[in-house]
A protein has these predicted regions:
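Active-site C-terminal subdomain of aminotransferase-like
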Residues: 1-90, 103
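PLP-dependent enzyme catalytic core of the Aspartate aminotransferase-like
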Residues: 113-116, 125-163
């Protein structure tokens, strides 16, 4: 049985909501038996409309996907070349691994002081010893913005002894 679920809260730019896709029979069964479906509230119409519009834009905007893939590859390559440990993948969420919670907090604070907003993640959000700075690349980022972020990461990484 193929069931796909997703969120409208991250990649789709919404604040809440999600979706499930499957064969019609599976969806009907979920509508009848799924406790989260039965005991939850409907999404506000404007959130649903924004989600539908985002899907429409994705379906017709191959250049955005291409730019996102290019930006992600550029960021991952440059950060790796600078000496950072980036969790492998091609997705635009690029975890910069630091492995130490206080270091991740300090690093995130220093980035903010440099004008770069990125969050330090550590236990219990991620497994113990897997602290990181979570970066999320966008098709809207310019090369100059990516370079600014990479340069700040590199300066702070040297300052804090990460690289």
């Amino acid at each position: 049985i193929d069931i796909f679920t997703g969120t409208l809260g991250k990649a789709m730019g919404g604040a809440l909501g999600g979706f499930t896709t499957a064969r019609a029979e599976v969806i009907e069964l979920l509508r009848q038996r799924s406790r989260p479906y039965l005991f939850s509230n409907s999404l506000p119409p404007h959130v649903v409309a924004a989600g539908i519009k985002a899907f429409d834009m994705l379906a017709s905007a191959g250049e955005l996907r291409t730019r996102l893939q290019e930006n992600t590859a550029y960021f991952r390559q440059r950060m790796g070349a600078a000496g950072f440990d980036i969790k492998p993948g091609v997705h635009p969420i690029c975890p910069v691994m630091l492995y130490d919670a206080p270091l991740a907090q300090k690093f995130a604070q220093r980035l903010l002081e440099e004008g770069i907003y990125a969050i330090g993640f550590f236990f219990p959000v991620v497994p113990q010893g897997q602290a990181r700075i979570r970066t999320q690349i966008s098709a809207a980022h310019t090369r100059a913005q990516l370079d600014q972020a990479i340069d700040a990461f590199t300066r702070i990484g040297r300052e804090l002894g990460v690289i």
